[in-house]
Amino acid sequence: MVIFMTSCLKVLSMLMIFTMLGAIGFATGDLTADKLLVEKKARRLTLLSKGQILRTYKIALGGNPEGPKEREGDGKTPEGSYIIDGRNTRSGYHLSLHISYPNEKDRKRAKELGVSPGAQIMIHGMKNGLGWIGPFHTLYNWTQGCIAVTDAEIDEIAPLVPNGTPIEIRP
């Protein structure tokens, strides 16, 4: 009986230590992304910190994902370098992080084409009321040009990605 109690105390002590270490890691900001990388062809979003991968997510994109966004309504997800410049906790898509599209290059291209470049490109969750779809949302590209993850994933991403974080969107 004494051996059993000693073993239980050791296990409980280890669990408490691991729990405290996890809380310390979050409290000190060890898990803050300093860059986001979107690879459209791979349909992948990666959160990076000091060149190390923090998290990777499978994503859905605009319904016409090949090539860079050229105009409003083209169903394309932009390509280029941007920043996360805001968030919307009252989003129609659970929660969203705003991407600074269009940049100067995008505006110039749209002006040359005589079109609006579009706006409101976000990383977001599922349309409100459809969170139950979860990971099945990646079976096809369904957004208007945004980058979509599950509700649980955007809830995980948002606190790890401060405003001002650079995001690179590659083909």
Describe each model-derived feature in a short phrase.
Residues 2-13:
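Bacterial N-terminal signal peptides that target proteins for export
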Residues 35, 56-58, 81, 120, ...:
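Well-ordered beta-strand positions in beta-sheet-rich domains
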Residues 31, 86-171:
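Exported/periplasmic cell-wall-interacting domains
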Residues 12-13, 47, 132-134:
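Short beta-strand/loop turn elements enriched in aromatics
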Residues 12-22:
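Bacterial N-terminal signal peptides
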Residues 28-34, 61-86, 105-109, 151-152:
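N-terminal post-signal-peptidase region of extra-cytosolic proteins
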Residues 25-57, 61-67, 72, 171:
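Intrinsically disordered, low-complexity
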